[in-house]
């Protein structure tokens, strides 16, 4: 994996075999989040993400607050294709998502069908190594392969996790489950960063799920 510091969101174009140009967003250290707009502006969220990403802006300081999830990401993934490159030991997590559209945590097919998965060798020019799965699934792999312990990131568990491992919280909203943290580990992994797209389903405090984009940077 590439150990260079990756600190910006970049947008590029890649020409497919058929000759058509497909946009690709490269998620680096930063997570795409959107400004804390009023609910009436929800329909504009996708356009906001595209505009900011196209400018190459750093968005990790902006907060993803309480918005209707589908309005944002369905519009977002309709226009943009996410290119995901992941290590071989994580790639098997993506196969069932691509085939069936849902994981145990409920990641919707409307998101995953827009993604394409590559090995590192297939995507060297992308300069990224990302996997997308639930935090529980990714946590199991990391615990097994890298001796890093993580667990569900809702409610008080977040604070327990951070206190136990001395993790630094980058952004957390107890209502929506937004969290970004880093763990300075050993062995092959220098930094493990989990950043999730959190949202609230009205009518139940814990009736929600979070897809996770995790970055693994080698020492």
Can you say where each PLM-predicted feature lies in the sequence?
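Juxta-kinase regulatory segment immediately upstream of eukaryotic protein kinase catalytic domains
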Residues: 1-13
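Conserved structural core of kinase catalytic domains
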Residues: 64-154
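Short, solvent-exposed loop/turn segments at secondary-structure junctions
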Residues: 37-39, 102-103, 115-118, 177, ...
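ATP-binding glycine-rich loop module of kinase domains
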Residues: 10-86
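Protein kinase-like catalytic core scaffold
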Residues: 30, 93, 110, 188-195
């Amino acid at each position: 994996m590439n150990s260079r510091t990756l600190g910006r969101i970049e947008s590029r174009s890649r020409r497919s075999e058929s000759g058509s140009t497909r946009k690709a967003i490269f998620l680096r250290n930063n997570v795409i989040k959107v400004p804390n707009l009023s609910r009436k502006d929800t329909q504009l969220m996708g356009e906001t993400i595209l505009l900011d990403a196209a400018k190459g802006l750093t968005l990790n300081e902006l907060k993803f607050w309480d918005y209707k999830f589908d309005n944002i990401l369905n519009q977002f993934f309709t226009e943009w294709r996410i290119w995901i490159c992941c290590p071989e030991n994580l790639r098997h997590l993506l196969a069932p998502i691509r085939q069936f559209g849902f994981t145990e945590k409920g990641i919707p097919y409307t998101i995953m069908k827009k993604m394409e998965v590559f090995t590192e060798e297939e995507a060297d020019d992308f300069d990224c190594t990302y996997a997308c799965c639930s935090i529980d699934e990714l946590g199991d792999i990391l615990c097994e392969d890298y001796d890093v312990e993580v667990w569900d990131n809702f409610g008080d568990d977040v604070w327990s996790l951070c206190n136990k491992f001395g993790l630094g919280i980058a952004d957390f909203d107890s209502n929506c489950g937004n969290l970004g943290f880093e763990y300075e580990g050993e062995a092959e992994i220098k930094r493990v960063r989990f950043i999730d797209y959190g949202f609230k389903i009205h009518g139940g405090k814990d009736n929600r799920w979070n897809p996770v984009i995790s970055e693994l940077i080698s020492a």
